[in-house]
Regions:
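Flexible, active-site-adjacent loop/turn segments at secondary-structure boundaries
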Residues: 3, 16-18, 132
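Pocket-edge positions in alpha/beta enzyme catalytic cores
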Residues: 4-5, 20, 62, 137
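Short, surface-exposed acidic-centric catalytic microdomains
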Residues: 17-66
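Glycine/proline-rich loop-helix segments at beta-alpha junctions forming the active-site rim
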Residues: 51-158
Length: 158
């Protein structure tokens, strides 16, 4: 199967040199319904950051990626991933960049109405453990969104 996903996010390359090799990644793989080996070694997943440089932390989360990075680098990187079937837009910066006029409200509303963005995009909240409060306030995410995401991922990779 030559399908791949693009996970668009604003995180910088971590010290380990491997994206999603942390608790956020554990949660993301759980949401996707795949194990670590499938995620890293199947050739089915691609990660394209919103910036290669981590801009630092702000009062309510990470600072935004540098302006112009995605415009300059994403078209070149996406040429290397010609068989993308689904793009996961993780967090507000990826969603704002890719959804343009499709943006309706905040991350929570985009995630709640994820079906409006299919089949091309699937907006997600960042899977950080820091989002425990968000998860508790939005039980519909685990009850409705995660099962739909898992079913879609399984359909694509099998």
């Amino acid at each position: 199967n030559t399908a791949s996903y693009t996970l668009s996010l604003h995180d910088a390359l971590p010290i380990s040199g491997i994206y999603w090799k942390d608790k956020s990644g554990d949660r993301l793989r759980e949401w996707l319904g795949v194990d670590e080996d499938t995620f890293y070694n199947s050739g089915l997943f691609a990660v394209i950051p919103m910036d290669f440089y981590f801009p630092g932390h702000g009062k309510s989360g990470d600072l935004p990626p540098r302006k112009g990075f995605a415009e300059k680098w994403h078209p070149q990187l996406l040429k290397e991933c010609p068989d993308i079937e689904l793009t996961l837009l993780i967090g507000q910066y990826a969603q704002a960049y890719y959804l343009h006029e499709k943006v309706s409200g905040k991350v929570t509303e985009r995630v709640r109405h994820f079906k409006n963005y299919l089949p091309e995009y699937f907006p997600l909240v960042h899977p950080s453990p820091r989002n425990q409060i968000w998860m508790a306030k939005n039980p519909w995410f685990a009850e409705q969104v995660v099962p739909d995401l898992q079913a879609l991922v399984q359909k694509i990779i099998h």
